[in-house]
Amino acid sequence: MSGDTERKNEVIPTKAAVKDTSALTDAVEQVAKQQQSQTSEIEKHKKILFQLQIELHELEKQIATIAEEAKETDRQMHRQDAAMENSKLQCGRLEAQIESLYSESLKLKFDTETAQEKFEEQMIKYNAYYVKIKAYKDNLGEIKSQCPFMTELYEKRDLIKNLKTMKEDLMENLQDSQGNCTIQIQEDISEIKNKIMTVKESITEKTSFVEEEKKTHEKLRKEIEVQHKRYDAILKRLHCQMNKIQLNRRKWQWNIQQLEKTAAELKKRIREKEASEIQSRPAAPWERIL
């Protein structure tokens, strides 16, 4: 009896041990499954972390690139602002030059009008003087052609020649003639001498008058030549001044047109730059990241 009881007692612990072992195995398997599941989750998280690290690195690269682009954009904007300021300054200088050239053009126009008025006044004076000199020449030629004392002078000279011839003939006759004719001949000679003296005095007076007239005519002729030369020089100088003023005026007008074209082109470029900057201004780095 005691032996059977002992066997029964041995069998009961064995079953309990088997049950405990089974439970332990299940627990170990469950733990292993949990560990395997955790390991799988860890691997997944590692992959996700690695992927996130890669994405973070790429994102940092993009941020650095965007920051560099933003810096370059800022530098370009600064350069464009400086270029715009320079263009505005150049436009201001060009506008000042245009105003100065416009003032010079007005001054040249005024000088041209003044020179034209002076030229017209000189031409009026010259024409009046020319008419006066021409009338004087015509009157002088008419006086010469109608002057009676010149004809008389030539006649007196012929008379003197004839009287001299007569005197010589009488002297010859005096030497050959009788004494009773001497008194008559002497009287004739005296009369002839008186006539000769009268004619000589008249000739001297007329010659003196003619010489004075010649001197006066020569003086007037020289004055006329001087006046002609003077007015010719004045006309040439005025023509040169007019040509120079017209040339300068055309030159200033051409310069003004060129400067106005340059100023318009610069203003157009400034407006285009401002419009392009407003349209193509890059977004902020944080906006691009989002």
UniProtKB/Swiss-Prot annotation:
Keywords: Coiled coil. The keyword Coiled coil applies. Residues 39-104, 152-279 form a coiled coil. This is Coiled-coil domain-containing protein 122. It comes from Mus musculus.
